[in-house]
Amino acid sequence: MIRLRPYKSCDAAKIAGWLTDRDIFLKWGGDRFGEFPITPQIIDEKYSRNNGDCTEPDNFYPWIAFDDEHGVVGSFIMRYLKGDNHILRFGWVIVDDSLRGMGIGTQMLRAGLKYAFEILGVDKVTIGVFETNTPAHECYKKIGFTDRETVVKEPWNLIEMEIEACRNQNI
């Protein structure tokens, strides 16, 4: 069973270790983390000291997913959009590369949605996925996110997705 806990600085090395090639790195963080390869220090700086580059204080919440069998298995972040505490954004979703395709991402994000809707009481959660990241797009659709729009960007178009509190029956 997947459980969530807040990110700790010691998790940065694990996350950096999953970003094994430039393609995975770009699909995970786009241009937000600079150049590949990434170091644990860069991740920790962004997560622990820079509030995820959010301009609003106390607006960025990185999470770690873990289970009893494998330990730490994934990570993602939550942040409120423009300070609106009714809309939450998920992002920087990554799963241990040795466990991809085993449903870990689905379980992790379902746990995140449960927390978002039941504990935080948000009305909607959004997420973006690059058009070229078919496995992630399918994962997000599987748990109930629906495509809202496609934003034309370089190097890849971005599919904006959302799920509303009343539509979270798959959680």
Specify the residue positions occupied by each region the protein language model found.
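Conserved acetyl-CoA-binding loop-helix of GNAT-fold acetyltransferases
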Residues: 95, 101-115, 138-142
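C-terminal "cap" of GNAT-fold acetyltransferases
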Residues: 88, 123-137, 142-171
